[in-house]
Amino acid sequence: MTDRTQNKGDDSGKLLYCSFCGKSQHEVRKLIAGPSVFICDECVELCNDIIREELQEGAATEGGGLPRPHEINRELDQYVIGQEHAKKVLSVAVYNHYKRLESRTSQDDVELTKSNILLIGPTGSGKTLLAETLARLLNVPFTIADATTLTEAGYVGEDVENIIQKLLQKCDYDVEKAQHGIVYIDEIDKVSRKADNPSITRDVSGEGVQQALLKLIEGTTASVPPQGGRKHPQQEFVQVDTSNMLFICGGAFAGLDKVIQERSERGGIGFSAEIKGEGERASVGETLQTVEPSDLVRYGLIPEFVGRLPVIATLNELDQEALVQILREPKNALVKQYQKLFEMEGVELDLRDDALRAVADKAMERKTGARGLRTIIEQVLLETMYELPSMENVSKVVVDESVIAGDSDPYIVYAGPEHSKAASDE
């Protein structure tokens, strides 16, 4: 059998080049010869990577098909603690959305309409994380847009087409892939009307944005500048159909509970009305569970916009137990992350149970939810993480409730005969 490879040192008298990248035999480790062509080892490796990626994508889409609601919920459980009702609503809505896309390929008299989602919940309750986890599970492009930066077309600020442009950038301008993506629009409550009545002045960042988002969310063909360029009349635009995209809007909707209470109290006037004392009022989370489209309209969303978001999921404020679980249990739990960082220094990090409860209490006081947990731990461990790489014979760092409260520094345990001491003693 003839050897069809060319090594760098072969003296054939003729300099050979890769037919694909143009590199000479002296610039690569090996050239493989074919009928009148050569390919180098680097191009072979690149081709293997491309094939491997395509096979993985194919396996993700074909392997088992679309995940069932139970499977979606189970995946969400690995990253999002609590919020069982919201996870169930999302699992069903996402399953039905992608089932609708499958049904569009078949000839059927029944046309399934799109069901976009509205997430209502306080800061740090897991709205963004739920959307991110869904996109990762379904292996579809995902982007986050901030509604507060959006304005009507023609005004200073981002127009709504920028959202689609970001999604296209995430999938290297693969239009077909982008058309099946998920878009999460955060802070949607900040574009509400300032009053229940339509304003006579131009509201370019409030009601104007809602009007601009209407068609995009319902399904339209958006014109996006190619490769992130600015719009000008002479250029050709990339046409993107948004009718198969899933839009998830999220917001804290501070004060919405009062709107709901007013509506429920108005409905209970007369002799048969149930009178409740101050202590008998439902919690904010329980009140939000009873939200109706009319409440959102009174809050400041225009009726047409509310109609485009038929699926509503409410998230509760996280209590101490849920925050401690978030610190410990998910795949990307903060405790596991910091323990890994310390492990890379050859040191064990021991975050005691009372310390985790104290961190949770601090986050609740600050009303930052799960988002504030990292900040608290970072502040507590900053000095230790600064000194640790320069210290020797450290085997363990212990953090208890007093450390979180600021009464003492983390305790450092040495591997040798030395006694344990606080980080500040160094």
Curated annotation (Swiss-Prot):
Residues in coiled coil: none
GO biological process assignments: cell division; proteolysis involved in protein catabolic process
Nucleotide-binding as UniProt keyword: yes
Domain ClpX-type ZB: 6-59
InterPro entries the UniProt entry points to: AAA+_ATPase (IPR003593), ATP-dep_Clp_protease_ClpX (IPR050052), ATPase_AAA_core (IPR003959), Clp_ATPase_C (IPR019489), Clp_protease_ATP-bd_su_ClpX (IPR004487), ClpX_bact (IPR046425), P-loop_NTPase (IPR027417), Znf_CppX_C4 (IPR010603)
Domain of life: Bacteria
Regions crossing the membrane: none
Binding site for ATP: P122, T123, G124, S125, G126, K127, T128, L129
Signal peptide: none
Keywords: ATP-binding, Chaperone, Metal-binding, Nucleotide-binding, Zinc
Binding locations of Zn(2+): C18, C21, C40, C43
Gene Ontology terms: cellular component: HslUV protease complex
GO MF assignments: ATP binding; ATP hydrolysis activity; ATP-dependent protein folding chaperone; protein dimerization activity; unfolded protein binding; zinc ion binding
HAMAP family named in the record: ClpX
Stated family: Belongs to the ClpX chaperone family.
Function text: ATP-dependent specificity component of the Clp protease. It directs the protease to specific substrates. Can perform chaperone functions in the absence of ClpP.
Subunit relationships: Component of the ClpX-ClpP complex. Forms a hexameric ring that, in the presence of ATP, binds to fourteen ClpP subunits assembled into a disk-like structure with a central cavity, resembling the structure of eukaryotic proteasomes.
Protein name: ATP-dependent Clp protease ATP-binding subunit ClpX
Name of the coding gene: clpX
